Amino acid sequence: MGGFGGALKNISIGIASTHGNTNIHTAGVTTEAAELFNNLPPQDHFLESMADACKAVISYKGAENMLYINVANRLSVDCDCDSHPAEPEMSDLGIFASVDPVAVDQACYDAVVNSPDPGKKALIERMDSRHGIHTVEAAAQHGLGNREYEIISLDE
């Protein structure tokens, strides 16, 4: 698991075919799903592979043609691919949108960390134990966006 499921995870893992997903999860070792669990790479290699896939998608579609929307509700420690995910422990944080996938994911990560919600503890532990922010770091290094952002609230 990537440790953090936002825009970057969804434009890499979410768009990829079964063979593409296997290629991402194994950091390029294989595209054969039957070989996936025998070829799991170090965690950071997997996260960097997600950033590589993001770069490919954005390059193909054109950054000017993309908008990223993260709906931060019912936040669970488990991936949405888990057939039996843990119940959410954290309240909703809102909807985040940007033309910058790095900024929107960094903003969501920071919103979790800075939330007063006591339910954040388990989510932060999961993100940190999986080095979830590394996909954001790698995507920024690829030039896919900026980790600095400004929150503009539409509620106020």
PLM-predicted stretches and their roles:
Residues 1-156:
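Extended, low-polarity segments enriched in aliphatic/aromatic residues
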